[in-house]
Amino acid sequence: MPEGPEIRRAADKLVEAVVGKTLTRVWFAFPELKPYETELVGQQVRQIETRGKALLTYFSHDRVLYSHNQLYGVWRVVNAGESPETKRDLRIRLETQDRAILLYSASDIEMLTLDTLTAHPFLQRIGPDVLDLSLTPEQVCERLLLPRFRRRQFSGLLLDQAFLAGLGNYLRVEILWQAQLAPQHTASQLNEEQLQTLSRALLEIPRLSYNTRGTVDENRHHGAIFSFKVFHREGESCERCGGTIERTMLSSRPFYWCPHCQS
């Protein structure tokens, strides 16, 4: 599943293509969204933003389109009138005079209003977004020590969007390597220095990934040029200590780590 940095980079491309422009053609695959097709034509796309792994598209008459890519959803930017050849199922087409944005394969799509947006179950449940630059390591540390999070193992906690939105499996792996922590630990077991190191890594790694990822290549892990230290490096040497990177399954996801320096 694409993680927060990939969703934010996709949103950046959508913003460049259609924000501030008037819609000339709108198409939705799902019957419940069909009534909005004619309503949205002539409206402007005011803003596109991410909340964790969800994407929100704001229109000039206060409608908000909610979409979540889940495992297989992907956005594409094309020229107006263009329909790329693909085996994916088209879900959304929002077209302006010169560009169009297309959503394929996703199924979690809803039309909301500014009034109903805050009541959406997913948006109510998620924690602060790791790519929100106003979020500080001190605030993350406070969150780690909240009663509902402090005794949860990091292997599961770092996948829980209620803790911090936008994290996922490769970020979980890389963050714990950076913090030199084994996945079975909990925040309640850490000393002050370890808490500070983990809190910084929880923000630095996702932001570094967002700032250093390239054009999507579907044959790679979401087009990553971000330098993985342990993810997908089973059997290789750890660059920090020379130990052997291992792979196991944690919370039903593959987990990569160096048992020698992650303790």
Swiss-Prot record:
Q: Does the keyword Transmembrane helix apply?
A: no
Q: Which stretches are zinc fingers (FPG-type)?
A: 229-263
Reactions catalysed, semicolon-separated, are: 2'-deoxyribonucleotide-(2'-deoxyribose 5'-phosphate)-2'-deoxyribonucleotide-DNA = a 3'-end 2'-deoxyribonucleotide-(2,3-dehydro-2,3-deoxyribose 5'-phosphate)-DNA + a 5'-end 5'-phospho-2'-deoxyribonucleoside-DNA + H(+)
Q: Where does DNA bind?
A: 70, 125, 169
Which cofactors are required for activity?
Zn(2+)
The terms under GO molecular function for this entry are: class I DNA-(apurinic or apyrimidinic site) endonuclease activity; damaged DNA binding; oxidized pyrimidine nucleobase lesion DNA N-glycosylase activity; zinc ion binding
Superkingdom, taxonomy of origin:
Bacteria
Q: Which family does it belong to?
A: Belongs to the FPG family.
Output this protein's name.
Answer: Endonuclease 8
What's the source species for this entry? Pectobacterium atrosepticum (strain SCRI 1043 / ATCC BAA-672) (Erwinia carotovora subsp. atroseptica)
